[in-house]
Amino acid sequence: MQGRLSAWLVKHGLVHRSLGFDYQGIETLQIKPEDWHSVAVILYIYGYNYLRSQCAYDVAPGGLLASVYHLTRIEYGVDQPEEVCIKVFAPRSNPKIPSVFWVWKSANFQERESYDMLGILYDNHPRLKRILMPESWIGWPLRKDYIAPNFYEIQDAY
């Protein structure tokens, strides 16, 4: 089943895959990493100027990593927002996705957290470094194949 945004993207020749609707009726689309930045700019111009949230998850041990964007478009008033969920999948061996910081500034800390927890590299992010874990931390704690260390010592800065 194709939603309104999916039909609009097809009409304008933009490559994507419709993943249907979630339990709240929000349209979900899959965009390839190489197409994501240009599609993000087009969505912003089309009216999706609010990035409500960005998160990431590990699809399966040894499988793909996903970066998820929840966008909102308010065209007919705040009581009738149009929402869409965009999923961008990247291979675990080279998890690179273009950063949308330059489109939606609110992606800054959210993309940094996804990098810190899952190791997804967001190309052209202005300050992609760890935000929750110490810089010396080894590995990506939310990956399903992550092996937690038995002991980790945090040295006091004093």
From Swiss-Prot:
It is found in: Plastid, Chloroplast thylakoid membrane. One of its GO terms (cellular component) is chloroplast thylakoid membrane. HAMAP family: NDH1_NuoC. PANTHER family: NADH DEHYDROGENASE [UBIQUINONE] IRON-SULFUR PROTEIN 3, MITOCHONDRIAL, NADH DEHYDROGENASE UBIQUINONE IRON-SULFUR PROTEIN 3. Keywords: Chloroplast, Membrane, NAD, NADP, Plastid, Plastoquinone, Quinone, Thylakoid, Translocase, Transport. It is an enzyme of class 7 (translocase). Its EC number is 7.1.1.-. This is NAD(P)H-quinone oxidoreductase subunit J, chloroplastic. It is a peripheral membrane protein. Its main location: plastid. It comes from Citrus sinensis (Sweet orange). Belongs to the complex I 30 kDa subunit family. NDH shuttles electrons from NAD(P)H:plastoquinone, via FMN and iron-sulfur (Fe-S) centers, to quinones in the photosynthetic chain and possibly in a chloroplast respiratory chain. The immediate electron acceptor for the enzyme in this species is believed to be plastoquinone. Couples the redox reaction to proton translocation, and thus conserves the redox energy in a proton gradient. It catalyses: a plastoquinone + NADH + (n+1) H(+)(in) = a plastoquinol + NAD(+) + n H(+)(out); a plastoquinone + NADPH + (n+1) H(+)(in) = a plastoquinol + NADP(+) + n H(+)(out). GO terms for molecular function: NADH dehydrogenase (ubiquinone) activity; quinone binding. InterPro entries: NADH_DH_suC, NADH_quin_OxRdtase_su_C/D-like, NADH_UbQ_OxRdtase_30kDa_su, NADH_UbQ_OxRdtase_CS. One of its GO terms (biological process) is photosynthesis, light reaction.
